[in-house]
Swiss-Prot record:
This is Glutamyl-tRNA reductase. InterPro entries: 4pyrrol_synth_GluRdtase, 4pyrrol_synth_GluRdtase_dimer, 4pyrrol_synth_GluRdtase_N, GluRdtase_CS, GluRdtase_dimer_dom_sf, GluRdtase_N_sf, NAD(P)-bd_dom_sf, Shikm_DH/Glu-tRNA_Rdtase. One of its GO terms (biological process) is protoporphyrinogen IX biosynthetic process from glutamate. GO terms for molecular function: glutamyl-tRNA reductase activity; NADP binding. The keyword NADP applies. NADP(+) binds at residues 189-194. The record marks 99 as: Important for activity. It is an enzyme of class 1 (oxidoreductase). Catalyzes the NADPH-dependent reduction of glutamyl-tRNA(Glu) to glutamate 1-semialdehyde (GSA).
Length: 418
């Protein structure tokens, strides 16, 4: 059994590739079923966010393992293997464990130390448990990563400063508009990122917020909290002209805001500028919108410079966090190896007990038939000794024939021979 982590993220692939490799929430079960149908995959978790798509797997070793998994990923998303191969990373065993711990702790995020990723990892794990999780090793790896992420946040200052994609989006808005108290903001979506954006905007006393979402009920809960108006996604075309700032983050597989829609809104606004911040993957706003005069479009990749400005105080904490992760990953792999040894020990003991029970039963039967006790006991001892040392003897003989002194020494040590 081997633990794997493979995927792409904001550091290895642009948004144009990440959106093609992402898994939509409504098709996640189908993707997991397809993944687990691969003969080498024992268990799997799919993590798909705006900044990364990753597969965490428990697999059986085989020579073409990497090629088979890349082929599955490309076939599933209808991608050319060459397009994906150069952006794909691949981690195995200790490196896979360390990678997941870093991801869950926010050490591999676009925003160093951001807490939202832990919730996303937990959700990915929970989704995988709906009939998909089969290997205790993978499950244990995730559970351990959750506790490591908590330890990192508790023992370091990695989360001391409030920087996130949501915070960066609001920072961008405040840089472009002198005061948010005079602007109207349209938020598209009502997920965790938009919730954070809405709370940031409320703190900066934005004049008006409108929330457009597929399901009104979820949006209404957020709207009640931040004092916003709720509209349907179908109303965006009509209401877009009111918005000075549009911040969008949905799980829609297709753009929600198109170039024509923005053109009409700008015309109604007499070309007053609009800021559009698209933090969704796949993108919610057609890229062509950025070519329009007075429409200022920023994608999640464009937020990098803003985010980088806020990272200085987290870098020292990240060094401490990396030390914790390295220690915890090493301890987890030691535990995993111990589990493997425990299984071998159980099998060996069970085998010895079967031999003991079999030969003891024969000896007792011979005694009941009136056989000589001393002869029967000597025969039992002789047969028991021969049966128990047979396999080690064969291994020692084979190692000697092969000239494998290292194996001979290991066997001598295992048998307690000086």
């Amino acid at each position: 059994m081997t633990l794997l982590a493979l995927g792409i993220n904001h550091k290895t692939a642009p948004v144009s590739l990440r959106e093609r490799v992402s898994f939509s929430p409504d098709k996640l079960d189908q993707a997991l079923d397809s993944l687990l149908a691969q003969p080498m995959v024992q268990a799997g978790v799919v993590l798909s966010t705006c900044n990364r798509t990753e597969l965490y797997l428990s697999v059986e070793e085989r020579d073409d393992l990497q090629e088979a998994l890349i082929r599955w990923l490309c076939d599933y998303h209808n991608l050319n293997e060459d397009d994906l191969r150069n952006s794909l990373y691949w981690h195995q065993d200790n490196d896979a464990v360390s990678h997941l711990m870093r991801v869950a702790s926010g050490l591999d995020s676009l925003v160093l130390g951001e807490p939202q990723i832990l919730g996303q990892v937990k959700k990915a794990f929970a989704d995988s448990q709906k009939g998909h999780m089969k290997a205790s090793e993978l499950e244990r790896m995730f559970q351990k990563s959750f506790s490591v992420a908590k330890r990192v946040r508790t023992e370091t200052d990695i989360g001391a400063s409030a920087v996130s994609v949501a915070f960066a989006a609001c920072t961008l808005a405040r840089q472009i508009f002198e005061s948010l108290s005079t602007v109207t903001v349209l938020l598209v979506g009502a997920g965790e990122t938009i919730e954070l954006v809405a709370r940031h905007l409320r703190e900066h006393k934005v004049q008006k917020m409108i929330i457009a979402n597929r399901t009104r009920e979820r949006a209404q809960i957020l709207a009640d909290e931040v004092g916003a108006e709720v509209i349907a996604l179908s109303d965006i075309d009509e209401r877009l002209r009111e918005a000075d700032i549009i911040i969008s983050s949905t799980a829609s597989p297709l753009p929600i805001i198109g170039k024509g829609m923005v053109e009409r809104a700008l015309k109604s606004r007499r070309n007053q500028p609009m800021l559009l911040v698209d933090i969704a993957v796949p993108r919610d706003v057609e890229p062509e919108v950025g070519k329009l005069a007075n429409a200022y479009l920023y994608s999640v990749d464009d937020l990098q410079s803003i985010i980088s400005h806020n990272l200085a105080q987290r870098k020292a904490a990240a060094v401490e966090a990396e030390t914790i992760v390295a220690q915890e990953a090493s301890e987890f792999m030691a535990w995993l190896r111990a589990q493997s040894a425990s299984e071998t020990i159980r099998d060996y003991r069970s085998q010895a007990e079967q031999v003991r029970d079999e030969l003891t039963a024969k000896a007792l039967a011979a005694l009941e038939q009136g056989g000589d006790a001393q002869t029967i006991m000597q025969d039992l001892a002789w047969k028991l000794t021969n049966r128990l040392i047979h396999a080690p003897t064969k291994s020692l003989q084979q190692a000697a024939r092969d000239g494998d002194n290292e194996r001979l020494n290991i066997l001598r040590d295992s048998l307690g021979l000086e």
